[in-house]
Amino acid sequence: MGCIMSQTDDAASRSKKIDRLLKEDQENANKTVKLLLLGAGESGKSTILKQMRIIHDVGYTKDERRVFRSVVFGNIILSLNAIIAAMEQLKIEYEKEEHRADARKVLAFGATGEEDEIPDELAALMKSVWSDEGIQKAVARSREYQLNDSAEYYLSQLDRICEADYIPTQDDVLRTRIKTTGIVETQFIFKDRLFVVFDVGGQRSERKKWIHCFEDVTALIFCVAMSEYDMVLMEDRKTNRMRESLKVFDSICNSKWFVETSIILFLNKKDLFEEKIKKSPLTYCFPEYTGHDNFDDGSAFIQKQFEIVNKRQGGQKEIYTQFTCATDTNNIRFVFDAVTDIVIRDNLRTCGLY
């Protein structure tokens, strides 16, 4: 009889332990927020991920920033090469013949995309070429060819960047351009929750890999480069970038994978958009647009174009839209704080705790 009682007590004890562990696992799961960061290529996703590391983690140490030297150098050289090539393509004349000769020498140096250093001779040539008025005209027409957003930022600071002891700043790191391939995962603690953020390659060739991130995602952040309404894709040089973003957002927003998932729309690069719309009309992408060529009218129109693709409107599925500047740490800090409250609230509602 005593043995039977002992076995019964052991079974009850094991059952309670299992129940407690299951409860703890559920509580931990409820405190984990998984964010999927999506968007077309060059929408600013990776920059936003870097901001999250700066804001919510330790940022980048001096040694880590030093590693980005080669990336900055590569971005600068490739950008200047693209501008020089565009001079001929756009039939823009150099202000001075000596600058044309220096441009040829810059091209002769070649570029791998990640240079270990910028030789003094190349630095002097680059500064000479960058000072040319014709080069500045080519930069102003960058929508007509492929040029990194960071090009002007870096090239205007060649004196600092070409110093022998140069170490990239946090801002320099934020503006580096490295194509995201595959899936990059970042984790940090914020508001007593573990955030796991997945950045997925944005170019067309990478999208087939997104499916592996879909399970159990708490929320989705979709990034759109507002300023690219008058530009074409790097992949095919024909498709309008804004139209491509709309197409991808439609497929994501209405996907069976995201029926219960909160969707946050980041209309990014608002600073570039505000300047560009003054000189490049929004009708380039949207012929039906009748508003003024200013930020307020243009941004409201773009927001509407994305929100109307939602086939689960009327309370079934809400899209939370934020206007962002991924290179502005204070802006991303403010926006992410607001977004986090939305995500936590929706997550609690899904768990039946709100």
UniProtKB/Swiss-Prot annotation:
Residues 172-180 are annotated as: G2 motif. Keywords: Cell cycle, Cell division, GTP-binding, Lipoprotein, Magnesium, Metal-binding, Mitosis, Myristate, Nucleotide-binding, Palmitate, Transducer. Residues 195-204 are annotated as: G3 motif. The keyword Ubl conjugation does not apply. One of its GO terms (cellular component) is heterotrimeric G-protein complex. Disulfide bonds: none annotated. Mg(2+) binds at residues 46, 180. Residues 31-354 form the G-alpha domain. Gene3D superfamilies: GI Alpha 1, domain 2-like (1.10.400.10), P-loop containing nucleotide triphosphate hydrolases (3.40.50.300). A lipid is attached at residue 3 (S-palmitoyl cysteine). One of its GO terms (molecular function) is G protein-coupled receptor binding. A lipid is attached at residue 2 (N-myristoyl glycine). Residues 264-271 are annotated as: G4 motif. InterPro entries: Gprotein_alpha_I, Gprotein_alpha_su, GproteinA_insert, P-loop_NTPase. Residues 324-329 are annotated as: G5 motif. GTP binds at residues 39-46, 174-180, 199-203, 268-271, 326. Residues 34-47 are annotated as: G1 motif. Coiled coil: none annotated. Pfam families: G-alpha. Guanine nucleotide-binding proteins (G proteins) are involved as modulators or transducers in various transmembrane signaling systems. In the 1-cell embryo, probably together with goa-1, controls nuclear rotation and spindle elongation during mitosis. During the first embryonic cell divisons, plays a role in gpr-1/2 cortical localization and in the proper orientation of EMS blastomere mitotic spindle. PANTHER family: G PROTEIN ALPHA I SUBUNIT (PTHR10218:SF227), GTP-BINDING PROTEIN ALPHA SUBUNIT (PTHR10218). G proteins are composed of 3 units; alpha, beta and gamma. The alpha chain contains the guanine nucleotide binding site. Belongs to the G-alpha family. This is Guanine nucleotide-binding protein alpha-16 subunit. The lineage of its organism: Eukaryota, Metazoa, Ecdysozoa, Nematoda, Chromadorea.
